[in-house]
């Protein structure tokens, strides 16, 4: 086993094809991190001219000190039962980390706990310090230790059937409501950034400037690894459908009126009246929208990312208006369809805790993500390889105070 010099294209091809590959290990992802002060270097190891493992090393300077942190997000990308590959990757990473004056090498492999016995054993044997099995969204981790993933390698009918019952109904209703899901372009990021601002104000979190999303799109879209989706509500076609629906409901009620007025028929008439009233409300809303925005308005948007057969719901945003049209439900299903059609077998909703209490800040995330036919992907967590013990200890002691300050600020924003 030896170090190899490979092209960025070869690195990305290996990452996309490997079971432990991840979006965060793609070379263009490193480009998106430059705005926040990170820079990257890459390593590869192999034998007989065949790549066995790779890693993208991100470095960030420690404020006011001539040192850096080396962070291998969702790496190494290799078979963790291969001790020699891990040892050779670590040696290569240490060489570069020392050149960059890193005080530690941090990794958080895309290896799940139920398949991670070899990884835990081998990494500890190499001298890595395991950071424990804390909650998925613990502030002690850089990346979530737990994510929710939907298997999408199935038909549309089977995919919807995999969702929880109430969510199935909402998705089917969303598809009937008439919103349009668009695969947008760079220009659409303006709309997306505006929706994100609305979302941040509603949910109490700081939002990114449009340049952040442009950076991601510019870096990853050319290779097909980033797509922007927007959901639009256009009043004219929706009005046509609603008026047709109203006509059918009124016909149904008229037929019921000609029947014997027993309890069963009266209940059906009452149900028809309720549906007619709700449909008329929607028609009134669309008439108003047609007068103010005849071309329609955008209600939600999201960035969908790819790394080989893995797809990721990265950022989502939505308007406060017309939420009864369920634009997010339509968008999620449409993005799953697109991901599947473009070779993905999984759809990652991102970080979560495992069944948090109702009073947890993360309960809402859990309840949203669990209804989409997801399973909990619990990773083995973070590992640190310490290169400068005194500095490492100082920084580890300071981090809890910084974390508390961030939590305090976040709670103030939500008030």
Swiss-Prot record:
It is an enzyme of class 2 (transferase). GO terms for cellular component: cytoplasm. Its main location: cytoplasm. It is found in: Cytoplasm. Keywords: Acyltransferase, Cell shape, Cell wall biogenesis/degradation, Cytoplasm, Peptidoglycan synthesis, Transferase. GO terms for molecular function: aminoacyltransferase activity. It catalyses: beta-D-GlcNAc-(1->4)-Mur2Ac(oyl-L-Ala-D-isoglutaminyl-L-Lys-D-Ala-D-Ala)-di-trans,octa-cis-undecaprenyl diphosphate + glycyl-tRNA(Gly) = beta-D-GlcNAc-(1->4)-Mur2Ac(oyl-L-Ala-D-isoglutaminyl-L-Lys-(N(6)-Gly)-D-Ala-D-Ala)-di-trans,octa-cis-undecaprenyl diphosphate + tRNA(Gly) + H(+). InterPro entries: Acyl_CoA_acyltransferase (IPR016181), FEMABX (IPR003447), PG_Glycine_Bridge_Synth (IPR050644). GO terms for biological process: cell wall organization; peptidoglycan biosynthetic process; regulation of cell shape. Its EC number is 2.3.2.16. PANTHER family: LIPID II:GLYCINE GLYCYLTRANSFERASE (PTHR36174:SF1). Catalyzes the incorporation of amino acid(s) into the interchain peptide bridge of peptidoglycan, using aminoacyl-tRNA as amino acid donor. Belongs to the FemABX family. This is Lipid II:glycine glycyltransferase. It comes from Staphylococcus saprophyticus subsp. saprophyticus (strain ATCC 15305 / DSM 20229 / NCIMB 8711 / NCTC 7292 / S-41). The gene is femX.
